[in-house]
Amino acid sequence: MKRTAKMLTAALLALALALPGTAAAADDTPAVRISEMMYKNHATLQDADGDFSDWFELENTSNRVVRLKGWSVSDGKTVWDFPADATIPRGGVRVVFASRKDKTAAGESHTSFALGEGETLYLIAPGGTIADRAACDPELPADHVLRRENGGELTESVWATPGYPNTAAGYAAFCESRKTESPLVINEAAVYNDTFALKGEY
């Protein structure tokens, strides 16, 4: 039954996109939008499984908590529903991995589809209206993102900030979060073009 419902939703989405004047989200729908997206994630953000999966970030621009029950995302072919208990705090963000893993575990949500070059990510509000969309630019280099800054349009950037504000301070905070404590440190490095012999203790 659930599979049939998803297939029907995908069919209706495809039909809606083929028609002129595709409906936007209703005025009373909470203001949720796609705030950042990376679909060539080679070395930026690992999921709990250690994989560098595609990912996108949703931003709640309203002054209330948004419950994502009834919300879904799609690549135009497959529709993935948010877990009934998923939320975004007011003024906050939620990172979702587009990994084809179709699971929610370890505090992470994974869609049943991945993002590909030339595809479009759709954010679908309850009732089937399209709240937002973002196209995957095939020319975007690896580990670059599309993100909004100061509430503007999605633009290319080298500064990924998943889970943090799309600002210089947010990028610094994201970089800081990736640091790990280790007893091992690099205390010397050199590059030599010629062979050499080691003498003494080493």
Please tell me what each predicted stretch does.
Residues 13-17, 23-202:
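Intrinsically disordered, low-complexity linkers and terminal tails enriched in Ser/Thr/Pro/Gly
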Residues 1-12:
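Bacterial N-terminal signal peptides that target proteins for export
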Residues 1, 19-20:
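General N-terminal leader/first-domain-start detector
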